Amino acid sequence: MPMAELEQVFRRYDANGDGKISAEELASVLRALGAPLGPGEVRRMMDEMDSDRDGFVDLSEFAAFHCGPTPAHGGKGGDAKDQEAASEAELREAFRMYDADSNGKISARELHRVLRQLGDKCSVADCSRMIRSVDADGDGCVNFDEFKKMMGGGGGRR
């Protein structure tokens, strides 16, 4: 994911605009996405991202987490296959939040619904344009492989 897009997502999470995401802000966004988590699960997510252990996630920590954390950027190091499996599971969970009808594809309307819940003022037409930019197979939707490429910054753009 390009840094400009990561910054835009970060700003959605950073509700008070102080340049860092608190556990409360993370929990609020997850509730808006229809994925309310208990305090323990929110804390676990924060711990995964908060490499300097100050209790908040700043933009650099957020970017490192979403672009494949390394041990130098707060990652756990360890077995690459374990990290890849954990990353794949997290991506699948994120994909399911967007895929409201569980058909394995994210439509412009599904993307629009989630972005509106996050406070974005975009239109369905804007969402269609976003989807076209990553829709490698031309079906008008984003499947999991396209979503994975988009989230990993690995191409898929036309």
From Swiss-Prot:
Domain of life: Eukaryota
Binding site for Ca(2+) 4: 135, 137, 139, 141, 146
Record keywords, A-Z: Calcium, Metal-binding, Repeat
Signal peptide: none
Domain EF-hand: 1-36, 37-72, 86-121, 122-157
SMART domains per the UniProt record, alphabetical: EFh (SM00054)
GO molecular function: calcium ion binding
Annotated Ca(2+) 3 binding sites: 99, 101, 103, 105, 110
Function (record text): Potential calcium sensor.
Name this polypeptide is given: Probable calcium-binding protein CML18
UniProt source species: Oryza sativa subsp. japonica (Rice)
